[in-house]
Amino acid sequence: MSDCPNDPYAYLLVHFLEDPDGYAERIYLDVSDGDNPHRWIPFNGRRPVVTSDIGTTGVRDPHIIRNPQTGMWYIIATDLRVFGGDNGGWYEWSHHASTNLIVWQSPDLLHWEGPRMLDVSQRADGTHMQLGMAWACECL
């Protein structure tokens, strides 16, 4: 992790960029300069760490979580492409948008598998609930 500072204590920031010209609705990781939350160092040379080629192909509102039993890391994000997408607007996106979350997994925060879709409207019997969208997920 040559992009990371040498201090073993730091904060990790998972985020997306809103970029109407570059279609940057992809996921980025930054690490704080030690325990200073005012200075951030981008992972991966300012390039996204994960992107989506499924669903709407845009990902926003990411959340990162670690499974303490397996040590596996997960990034879970909203499946929504605003820029370069359908130009539907907030009403359309909030009432008739994707009910999928996009998921990646990694053993080390450097090597990611995925993406895969998780449809939160699907019931155990395979039928679907009437939902308008799935946004800004967080996990415990």
Task: Please annotate each region the language model reported.
Residues 1-136, 140:
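Beta-rich carbohydrate-recognition and catalytic domains
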